[in-house]
Structures are given as structure tokens and as C-alpha cells.
């Protein structure tokens, strides 16, 4: 399943040419005992948090830099990086979720460069 949220450069015209929803400001996914709050990151981010409970996950890609850090009360901040415009010498990358395992992968080779079990 593909999950998309609106980015800071996305507009209604983008939705008109796609067959799946891309304009939500956020999505919430239950994974095990955690909730993943997925958003682009230009509205909600680590300095302006959405309503997270202890242990919940903030997932956003606005910075275009892969990241995985713990903060708050067992919360996690995850960033898949960017497939198109990576920053800070990071690889072109994306993230997958299978069961309760997140994997960061390089776009060209699909090689896993980080893995995290929630």
C-alpha cells in the first residue's frame, strides 16, 4: 500500500492527474502499540509537534535528510530522506514498512542502509 501526504509544493492540480489520494495534511497508522503520525513536515515537525502520545512516531520528510532519533517520552522521529532532491550528501532514498520494521533504502539499488523495528 502506498501512503501519501501533501507536501509544501503540492496543489489540487496534482490530485487531478493521480488515481490515489495525495492531498491529506497527515495520516495516522497504527503499528503494534504505537501510532505513526505521517506528515510532510512543513507544518508539524519536532519543534511543532502534532498530538503524540508517549511512544508514538513522527514521520516526515521535509528536510530531505534520512533520520531516526528518539525524543520526548519514548517517541521517535523518522525521515525517509528524498527520492528526488536529497540534501546534506545523503543518498536518494525511500522508506518501507513491513509488519513493524522500517527500512531505509537507496533508490538506485534498493540496498538497505538502516533498519528499525518499532
Regions found by a protein language model. Give the residues of each.
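Active-site neighborhood of phospho(di)ester-bond hydrolases with catalytic His/Asp-centered motifs
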Residues: 2-8, 37-40, 57-62, 78-80
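Active-site environment of divalent metal-dependent phosphoester hydrolases
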Residues: 9-15, 43-48, 59-71, 84-89
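Binuclear metal-dependent phosphoesterase catalytic core
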Residues: 25-32, 71-72, 77-118
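Short N-terminal helix-initiation segments at or just after the protein's N-terminus
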Residues: 22, 39-45, 114-116
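Core catalytic region of metal-dependent phosphoesterases/phosphodiesterases
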Residues: 1-31
Amino acid at each position: 500500500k502506498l501512503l501519501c501526504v501533501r507536501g509544501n509544493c503540492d496543489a489540487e492540480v496534482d490530485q487531478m492527474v493521480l488515481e490515489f489520494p495525495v492531498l491529506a495534511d497527515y495520516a495516522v497508522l497504527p503499528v503494534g502499540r504505537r501510532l505513526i503520525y505521517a506528515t510532510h513536515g512543513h507544518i508539524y515537525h519536532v519543534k511543532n509537534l502534532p498530538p503524540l502520545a508517549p511512544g508514538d512516531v513522527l514521520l516526515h520528510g521535509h528536510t530531505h535528510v534520512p533520520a531516526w532519533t528518539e525524543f520526548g517520552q519514548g517517541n521517535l522521529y523518522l525521515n525517509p530522506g528524498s527520492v528526488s532532491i536529497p540534501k546534506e550528501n545523503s543518498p536518494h532514498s525511500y522508506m518501507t514498512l513491513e509488519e513493524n520494521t522500517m527500512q531505509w533504502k537507496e533508490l538506485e539499488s534498493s540496498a538497505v542502509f538502516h533498519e528499525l523495528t518499532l
